[in-house]
Amino acid sequence: MTIFNWVQKKLHQNVIKEIDGVRKNEKKKRNEGISEIEKNTKAILDQVGLVDALDNWFDGVLTIGTFGFDTLNFKEEDEMDDDECGSGDLDYVVIDGSIIKNVDQESDPLISVENKFYDHHEDVGNLYVQADTDHFGSIKTAETPAVTAAAEAEIEPQKKRTTLAELFMEDHDKGYDTWHCKKPNNPNLDGEEVKYYKQNGSKLSKRFSFVKKKLVMSKSKEEENDLRPIKKMRQMIKRMLKKKIHPDVDATKALKKDVPYKPTRNCEALESHYLLKIQDCVA
């Protein structure tokens, strides 16, 4: 209210000058039941009209509440309008600017606890209905069976939910199983499991397996022929090493502390120096 008073003071300085003494006697006049706001409004309405007072004000009126608006009267007017238009129990379904059907809300509600979703096709399918009016003026609808069957036939393929698994299954179902002349069933439609058949007993698999065995056998024989001289050479080298250089490697009774060659008394100096056997020193 302080903002409202400040705006009124700026707009009408002459009126407020006459009421300068009101501020000094605010407390006394409040006790008497007369407020400063009432004084200001009376002074403005006495000298200047409301239209002239708000002539130069373009930003609207700063007010708290509404002028000339009574909630009780407004509700009564709304009730009168509803009575004139008709009963409020009728439900109007409007699609593309045209009323399709008028049904009682109790008999056929749009959204109820049982119906969790609203289907647009159900309203479109009810375009062709047989309407019967009773003495109360309410309209009863009776759908023809042919129209309902056609509408359901159009709606059924649209209600199906397609997933990636179903798309893959459809691609698989297009090609029949050539080896067993059977087509696997879709589990989503018939509730049966899909069985994938292997191609083990086919002629092609036998031919491929025979060729594979032949290739393996030929490779193994060639490798054996190539590796035989190498094996023989390795065996010969091992025998030579055991006999000539390390004769006591395979001996079970030989110990690590024992010396492999014990020199004789006659040739101690030569054997200790050369560590080799000499024919003249052998006893």
Swiss-Prot record:
One of its GO terms (biological process) is morphogenesis of a branching structure. The keyword Kinase does not apply. Disruption phenotype: Erect inflorescence stem growth. InterPro entries: TAC1. A motif (IGT motif) lies at residues 60-66. Keywords: Growth regulation. Transmembrane segments: none annotated. Signal peptide: none annotated. The keyword Ligase does not apply. Expressed in shoots, vasculature, endodermis, petioles, shoot apical meristem, inflorescence stems, pedicels, styles and anther filaments. Involved in the regulation of inflorescence branch growth angle. Promotes horizontal inflorescence branch growth. Belongs to the TAC family. This is Protein TILLER ANGLE CONTROL 1. It comes from Arabidopsis thaliana (Mouse-ear cress). The gene is TAC1.
